[in-house]
Regions:
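Acidic, proline/glycine-rich low-complexity IDRs
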Residues: 2-126
């Protein structure tokens, strides 16, 4: 399964309405609030989940998914371009982040659909 394949949701098949999806090991939420996002990040910070992903699907955004992994106070944030982007296939990532930096990237993405400072992220091909 590709990275985008794990973002299956409860949205009806063929539904092209924009929505936000919060996903982690424990499950997913098709209509998360900012509080839901912070609770998911707290689970990651406490080692109670392996990852947290936030996707803005069916929207006109350059970055479709932001995800985080990590443990013991050190996290990696990845930003994945949308399927229609010329940047498709690249993974932007920033390593060795503390919990506050990780929260900052997720908060900005939740509110604006953009990853602040993306130009300072490293890049690899998926």
């Amino acid at each position: 399964m590709g990275i985008f394949g794990m973002f299956k949701s409860n949205q009806p098949a063929g539904d092209e309405n924009p929505y936000t999806l919060l996903k982690m090991k424990q499950g997913s939420n098709d209509a998360p609030t900012i509080d839901d996002m912070y609770k998911a990040l707290e689970l990651l910070e406490n080692g109670q989940t392996d990852y947290v992903s936030l996707a803005q699907l069916n929207q006109e955004v350059d970055i479709e998914v932001v995800q985080a992994v990590g443990e013991m106070g050190m996290f990696t944030v990845e930003a994945l371009p949308s399927k229609n982007s010329p940047e498709k296939g690249k993974i932007y990532y920033k390593e060795h982040l503390d919990e506050y930096s990780m929260q900052h990237y997720f908060h900005a993405y939740f509110e604006t659909g953009k990853v602040k400072g993306l130009e300072s992220f490293e890049v690899r091909k998926s």
